C-alpha cells in the first residue's frame, strides 16, 4: 500500500502576472500548471519560468498556497 507521508506531493503553479492583473479586474483568467515535487529535495516553494497562455509569454509561476 502507498505510504500517506509520501515525499512526493502534487502542487499547483500559478502565474504571477495574471494574479497581479486579476486584482485590477483586467485578467481574462488565471494560468495554472500542476506538477509533482519531492518535499525532501525541495522544501522551499517552487518558482519556475513557464508559458502563460493568457499573457502569451513566459512568466514566473510560483507554487500556490493550498
From Swiss-Prot:
Principal localization? plastid
Superkingdom field: Eukaryota
Keywords annotated in UniProt: Chloroplast, Plastid, Ribonucleoprotein, Ribosomal protein
Q: Which GO terms describe its biological process?
A: translation
- UniProt-annotated location(s): Plastid, Chloroplast
A GO molecular-function term, please? Answer: structural constituent of ribosome
Gene Ontology cellular-component annotations:
chloroplast; ribonucleoprotein complex; ribosome
Q: Which family does it belong to?
A: Belongs to the bacterial ribosomal protein bL33 family.
What protein name applies here?
Large ribosomal subunit protein bL33c
